Amino acid sequence: MTTPLLQDLQDRGLIAQASDLEEIQTLLSQPQTVYCGFDPTAGSLHIGHLVPLIMLKRFQDAGHQAVALIGGATGMIGDPSFKATERSLNSAEIVSGWVNDLSNQIQQLMNHQLSKPMIMVNNADWMRAINVIDFFRDVGKHFSINTMINRESVKQRLQRPDQGISFTEFSYALLQSYDFAELNRQYGCRLQIGGNDQWGNIVSGIDLTRRQNGEQVFGLTLPLITKSDGTKFGKTEGGAVWLDPSKTSPYAFYQFWLGAEDADVYHFLRYYTFLSCEEIASIEAQDQASQGKPQAQRILAEEMTRFVHGEEGLASAERITQALFSGNVQQLSLGELKQLELDGLPSIESAQQDLVELLIESGLASSKRVAREHISNNAISVNGEKVSADNPSLSFPLFDQYWLLQRGKKHFCLVKRAA
């Protein structure tokens, strides 16, 4: 009989591969320890990390113990799985700083939403204690080079004439496999989850844990989240969408989810939110009957912004959205303009008086030519009024301090006139 958790994950389309689904069903009939690893590649997580993080919460909410592993050791090397080129190696100081940042971020994000804390570990804590000879003897002897080079994630690199793979990256699978064996020893961990690109590493960890510990453990991977057009979900024109509000404001985060396509939004509600599949089906049915006024994008944006940034972050995002999209910008008070800046609307301070230069400085145009094209295409507004190509100039600043620049429907920048 399928456990309610596993049935829910299947209904949501959240299981890509499993080492033994029937055995996992049996395993999850009792409380278990489950882990997922996060390598530090920057000082913040991004939305690509949300599905595995949310997956850990789903397990913990179902009565299991979640473990989030930060790869202080593996992050020094970098996972080569399905990467086209060799990763750049970062210094120990940089990686250590990122480890602290991610650990704090995960704890702040997750623990207040859980009835008991998630366990946080750093694989550098045990990898530092192993010398290289012992590692090769005790771990390396269990790995077949033939098997490793035939894994699809490695084979793609080896088949490229312009790219090989260094021994450093090639050894990554051994380190991740050892993590599984170590967590099994320390915490009795018997299930690892990860992205589908981690399948080869997870299988290696299952095998090593069996050989070293005599324990049967299991793995489960999550699907690669793609949009209906086949492209990878999670980035914008400006790059990654970060969970750190200083890198991606709650407003920009909210707008990202609000922009989900109709063909994608119901899948995303299943992947990312804790709304039941029945509730999501009801939302979809209501949207189909609403004649072009769907509510799904707003619900998705609200749920995700609340999850990552809390009620306060959601309120600020909705406040900006209401101000920018529902009325005349010139009706905003000075206090409301200042609040937009505090709430995270893209903002700059400038003494520049030329509109074309300001469009470049604000990031709304990449060059003078592009700025002029936007103006010619009637895509630029200043303080809520379209700019004429015949007279591309700045209007008087609101309250003698602010210009609100807009490109198209969704791109804004608040410019404060420098004193």
UniProtKB/Swiss-Prot annotation:
GO terms for molecular function: ATP binding; RNA binding; tyrosine-tRNA ligase activity. GO terms for cellular component: cytosol. L-tyrosine binds at Y35, Y172, Q176. GO terms for biological process: tyrosyl-tRNA aminoacylation. InterPro entries: aa-tRNA-synth_I_CS (IPR001412), aa-tRNA-synth_Ic (IPR002305), Rossmann-like_a/b/a_fold (IPR014729), S4_RNA-bd_sf (IPR036986), SYY-like_C (IPR054608), Tyr-tRNA-ligase (IPR002307), Tyr-tRNA-ligase_bac-type (IPR024088), Tyr-tRNA-ligase_bac_1 (IPR024107). It catalyses: tRNA(Tyr) + L-tyrosine + ATP = L-tyrosyl-tRNA(Tyr) + AMP + diphosphate + H(+). Its EC number is 6.1.1.1. ATP binds at K235. A motif ('HIGH' region) lies at residues 40-49. It comes from the Bacteria. Pfam families: SYY_C-terminal (PF22421), tRNA-synt_1b (PF00579). A motif ('KMSKS' region) lies at residues 232-236. The keyword Cytoplasm applies. Residues 353-418 form the S4 RNA-binding domain. It is found in: Cytoplasm. Keywords: Aminoacyl-tRNA synthetase, ATP-binding, Cytoplasm, Ligase, Nucleotide-binding, Protein biosynthesis, RNA-binding. The keyword Cytoplasm applies. It is an enzyme of class 6 (ligase). Its main location: cytoplasm. Homodimer. HAMAP family: Tyr_tRNA_synth_type1. Catalyzes the attachment of tyrosine to tRNA(Tyr) in a two-step reaction: tyrosine is first activated by ATP to form Tyr-AMP and then transferred to the acceptor end of tRNA(Tyr). Belongs to the class-I aminoacyl-tRNA synthetase family. TyrS type 1 subfamily. This is Tyrosine--tRNA ligase 1.
